[in-house]
Regions:
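Intrinsically disordered regulatory tails of 7TM GPCRs
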Residues: 1-21, 179, 238-261, 323-396
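Intracellular effector-coupling site of seven-transmembrane GPCRs
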Residues: 75, 153, 160, 185-203, ...
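Seventh transmembrane helix
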Residues: 224-225, 266-273, 278-282, 299-355
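Extracellular TM2-ECL1-early TM3 structural module of rhodopsin-like
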Residues: 27-39, 66-129, 136-143
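Loop architecture of class A 7-transmembrane GPCRs
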Residues: 9-24, 93-117, 150, 164-219, ...
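Class A (rhodopsin-like) GPCR signature focused on the TM5-ICL3 interface and adjacent 7TM helical core
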Residues: 44-47, 125-137, 168-179, 213-246, ...
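Extracellular N-terminal segment of 7TM GPCRs
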Residues: 1-47, 92, 396
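Helix-to-loop junction signature of class
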Residues: 38, 42, 79-98, 115, ...
Length: 396
């Protein structure tokens, strides 16, 4: 790809050439591992997010609009991993140098757009989740706690992102690469490349699309994440100061603060993984020819890996930090199924239901404990009661 843009690297500098050479070497070495690593991450990620959706849709977990957004994030992540799993299977494990059928060429063209769109949707939904939590911390009766409002926001975000990704779909075209004849007839092979329209006038439309993608789908959500992270930290500090004054409300505020800390951890992880990608997207638009070929393509697999890792963030954070989530998770898994009741799992509301064997075992243990602590006087009274209750034939 040759575009009329400014130069970023001095190709006459030995240090620059050495760094670029190492990037190419890294790409060559990592490309041998990436397909297998990505395949495993996609398979495990699909299972993890399916379980995540199952847990968050339980009645005891549907009380929060944040959980509604988390379900939508999991669905988006599953779409990302499904598309990438199909891409890895066909274009890495079963690659064909001559080209592919028109169906697979069309899939590759759509995959280029879907991978960007679904990942951007996830990023904006994390921003929405942070906004909802911040609104709830300011006002406990915030309208953003309503599930319908949260779901409407998710739909609007998805529509906005897909509209922004239409130029990416148009930026690629399907080209015929091979034509041959077999005993079954004529066959055609196709590949996907950049559109000739996008490459005209010094890649004007291509650079415009890169700017559009870099700013609206990377830079802006990253900037919003930074703002909401700072706002959440500031709000937490204010709450801590209030708690020092109102000691009696500490227990009531503990759950809310705990939820905020979990969300803050998620936002921070997304920020550290997405901010470098946002910077690279801007540089890719500024220095398209050099940066795209020498840096972006050499690190493309690493960026894909970060995107796949982000698909695990919500499940891992909730699994390791939320006892309520873990208890609900154990209740829905077949091998660890235990029924729970009550609103709060922090106040000993664990119960066993509809399991006679468990009830009988508990009764036996309780009776054994009572028997073991009986005094001789208690045993004597029990024996007298048994004799008095012995069946006597009735007189007719």
């Amino acid at each position: 790809m040759e575009c009329n843009d400014s130069r970023l690297f001095d190709t006459n500098n030995n240090l620059t050439l050495f760094v670029i050479e190492q990037l190419y070497r890294f790409r060559y070495l990592y490309s041998n591992v990436h397909p297998f690593l990505s395949f495993v991450l996609c398979v495990l990620g699909l299972a993890a997010n399916a379980i995540h959706i199952l847990v968050l849709t339980r009645p005891r977990m549907r009380q929060s609009s944040v959980h509604t957004v988390l379900v939508c994030i999991a669905i988006s992540d599953m779409g990302t991993m499904t598309s990438y799993l199909m891409y890895i299977s066909r274009f890495e494990f079963l690659s064909d140098k001559e080209g592919y059928s028109y169906f697979w060429a069309l899939f590759l063209k759509c995959h280029a757009m879907l991978s960007i769109a679904l990942h951007a949707i996830t990023l904006y939904l994390v921003v929405l989740m942070a906004f909802i939590r911040l609104s709830a911390m300011k006002l406990t009766t915030s309208r953003w706690l309503d599930h319908t409002r949260a779901l409407t926001s998710v739909i609007l975000i998805a529509l906005f992102v897909f509209i922004m990704c239409v130029p990416t779909l148009l930026a690629h075209q399907i080209d015929e690469t091979t034509r041959g004849v077999t005993m079954h007839g004529i066959y055609y092979k196709y590949s996907v490349g950049f559109s000739t329209l996008m490459m005209k006038n010094g890649c004007f439309l291509m650079k415009a699309n890169l700017w559009l993608t870099g700013i609206f789908l990377k830079a802006i959500p990253c900037l919003l994440l930074v703002c909401f992270t700072i706002a959440l930290i500031h709000r937490l500090r204010e709450n801590n100061e209030k708690r020092k004054i109102l000691i009696k409300e500490e227990r009531a505020k503990k759950r809310g603060d705990f939820t905020t800390y979990m969300l803050l951890l998620m936002v921070t992880v997304f920020l550290f993984t997405e901010l470098p990608q946002g910077i690279m997207a801007i540089l890719n638009a500024l220095f398209t020819t050099q940066f795209h070929q020498m840096v972006y393509l050499n690190l493309a697999d690493v960026l894909d890996l970060l995107s796949l890792i982000n698909c695990y963030v919500a499940f891992l954070v909730y699994s390791f930090t939320s006892s309520r989530y873990r208890q609900t998770l154990f209740s829905v898994l077949p091998l660890t199924r235990v029924s729970y009741s009550g609103v709060s799992t922090r106040q000993g509301t664990l119960k066993c239901h509809a399991n006679p064997s468990v009830k009988q075992l508990v009764q036996r243990v309780n009776s054994a404990e009572v028997t073991s602590v009986r005094s001789p006087l208690m045993e004597k009274k029990a024996a007298q009661a048994t004799r008095s209750n012995t069946f006597q034939p009735a007189d007719f």
